[in-house]
Regions:
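Short, basic/low-complexity N-terminal boundary segments at the transition from targeting/disordered tails
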Residues: 14, 22, 29-35
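Non-catalytic, usually N-terminal nucleic-acid engagement modules in DNA/RNA processing proteins
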Residues: 31-198
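Short hydrophobic alpha-helical segments enriched in small aliphatic residues
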Residues: 8, 16-23
Length: 198
C-alpha cells in the first residue's frame, strides 16, 4: 500500500501510523501517544513527548544502540543516570538469530530478558539482511537469507518481521525495509521505497 492511499497526504500522529500499519490492538500501540510540546518559530525544529508502556521519551533524544538488547560496558543504571538514555535500540535480525524468539518469549519479552525497564525500539533488521549481499535473495514474498552465524536459511517478510518484533515486545517497531546503497540510482531507490511502503 502506498502512503498516499493510506493517509491521503495528511500528517498523522505516531499512534495513528502504528495503529494503521500494524492493524493491531497491541497494548503498546493503544497506549502510545505523541504530544508536540514546542515548535521553533524560525525553523522546522520541534520537541515532543512520546508516551509508551515503559515510560516517556522526550524528543529529540539520544538513543544508544544495544544490538542484542544489551549495552556493552555500561550498567543500565549508569545508562539512565549518567548518559540520560530514555530509550535503547535493539536489532530484530540479531535477536531473531541469537538468542532466538523461543528464549525471548520464555523470558517474558526483551525487557525482562535484558533487564532494561525503559522504552525500547527495534530496528527491523533490514539493513543487516540487505548488507548480506552474498547470502541473500530478494523476492516478491520477502528476503531469503543465510545466517551469518551458522549458514542456516531464513525468510524475512514484512509480516514475519512485525510478528518477531511483537514477540520481542518492543515499544516502537520499525517496518521491514529494503536498504539500497547510498549511491543507488534514483529509479532503484524509488522502487525500493515503494516496496517498503506496500
Amino acid at each position: 500500500m502506498r502512503k498516499e492511499s493510506i493517509f491521503g497526504g495528511k500528517i498523522v500522529t505516531l499512534y495513528e501510523l502504528y495503529a494503521h500499519v500494524f492493524e493491531v490492538g497491541a497494548k503498546s500501540v493503544e497506549n502510545m501517544k505523541f504530544t508536540l510540546e514546542h515548535k521553533a518559530p524560525s525553523s522546522k525544529a520541534r520537541a515532543g513527548l512520546i508516551q509508551t508502556d515503559h515510560g516517556p521519551i522526550q524528543t529529540p533524544i539520544f538513543m544508544p544502540v544495544g544490538t542484542a538488547a544489551a549495552m556493552k560496558g555500561i550498567f543500565h543504571r549508569d545508562l539512565k543516570e549518567e548518559a540520560k538514555a530514555q530509550i535503547i535500540l535493539a536489532n530484530t535480525y540479531h535477536l531473531y538469530l541469537r538468542p532466538g524468539m523461543d528464549i525471548i518469549e520464555k523470558a517474558g519479552g526483551v525487557h525482562r530478558f535484558s533487564t532494561w525497564d525503559g522504552p525500547m525500539l527495534t530496528d527491523s533488521g533490514g539493513f543487516q539482511v540487505f548488507s548480506l549481499s552474498d547470502c541473500r535473495k530478494l523476492k516478491e514474498e520477502g528476503c531469503h537469507f543465510r545466517s551469518h552465524i551458522d549458514g542456516s536459511k531464513h525468510l524475512f517478510t514484512p509480516e514475519s518481521v512485525i510478528d518477531t518484533e511483537r514477540t520481542i515486545g518492543a515499544d516502537i517497531m520499525m517496518a521491514f525495509d529494503e536498504c539500497p546503497p547510498g549511491d543507488a540510482p534514483y529509479d532503484y531507490a524509488a522502487k525500493s521505497l515503494a516496496l517498503t511502503e506496500r
